[in-house]
Amino acid sequence: MRLTPHEQERLLISYAAELARRRRSRGLLLNHPEAIAIITDHLLEGARDGRTVAELMVSGREVLGRDDVMDGVPEMIPDVQVEATFPDGTKLVTVHHPIG
């Protein structure tokens, strides 16, 4: 299987998010990279599903709460920006204060 660098990056994000979800389901608090992976994966998959940028900007804030992450992680992530592929092209999705 040959993957472009872009496809490799998406695969890495997807796997990191899946690993973080498994850890979260075991009751572990997520660290910074795990939180970013889950939020990023949510945005990429939402775009793939045909959701709008506005919808993702709102739903991206509902993926994780303070109870899901280690102390200090919400303050380390003031925003998440992802270039996602939508049915009508690539767009930048920005989620401000993604962990409420």
UniProtKB/Swiss-Prot annotation:
CDD domains: Urease_gamma
Reactions the enzyme catalyzes: urea + 2 H2O + H(+) = hydrogencarbonate + 2 NH4(+)
Alphabetized UniProt keyword annotations: Cytoplasm, Hydrolase
Gene Ontology biological process terms from the UniProt entry: urea catabolic process
The protein's annotated pathway: Nitrogen metabolism; urea degradation; CO(2) and NH(3) from urea (urease route): step 1/1
Cellular component aspect of the GO annotation: cytoplasm
EC number of this enzyme: 3.5.1.5
Localization terms from the record: Cytoplasm
InterPro entries xrefs: Urease_gamma, Urease_gamma/gamma-beta_su, Urease_gamma_sf, Urease_subunit
Molecular function terms from GO: nickel cation binding; urease activity
Subunit description: Heterotrimer of UreA (gamma), UreB (beta) and UreC (alpha) subunits. Three heterotrimers associate to form the active enzyme.
PANTHER family found in the cross-reference section: UREASE
HAMAP family xref list: Urease_gamma
Similarity section: Belongs to the urease gamma subunit family.
Full protein name: Urease subunit gamma
Species whose genome carries this gene: Mycobacteroides abscessus (strain ATCC 19977 / DSM 44196 / CCUG 20993 / CIP 104536 / JCM 13569 / NCTC 13031 / TMC 1543 / L948) (Mycobacterium abscessus)
